[in-house]
Amino acid sequence: GIIYDRNGEVLAYNKLAYAITIEDVLSSGIDKSDKLNEIIYNTIKIIEENGDTINNDFSIIIGSNGKCEYSVTSDMAKLRFLRDIYGKSKIEELDTEKEQLSDNTAEEVFEYLVGKKRYDISEEYPKEDRLKIAIIRYNLSLNSFQKYISTTIASNVKDETVAAIYENQAMLKGVSRTMDIECIGY
């Protein structure tokens, strides 16, 4: 609702906002990963063509030199990120006699995520798009034991983006829009 001050001036109001979400609804199979990557790629393209951006709080970015780099500044934040990426329960488990995961560069983590061991993202996609697909796949994997929970790809998107998603619903299995209420304050 609308909140007024004692003089009748608007202090805050609610605004309808749309978000684009995805659920993993594909059946298991040999080409499931390729299909999911293609759905995510097509969704990203629609979102960006309409001037919106995907949600990205991932700790890897592509630097000006075209190489991946960490976006976190503290060593502890980097180690927590690596722990989560490699599925370890403790930071201490990153380093064993067999491997030293705590020393991995952002480029090595990127190659792990897009490689066959994890999300198998085709090199046909540009590097920046491969990273975006990996980010969304990683966020989807956080709900892998509760497949019915959707993952938000983009928030507060334009009506044009919502319309384009609906127009392409047949090729975007599992992708939908949700409505959120955004509180706007002065």
Task: Annotate the PLM regions.
Residues G1-Y186:
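Membrane-proximal periplasmic segments of bacterial cell-envelope enzymes
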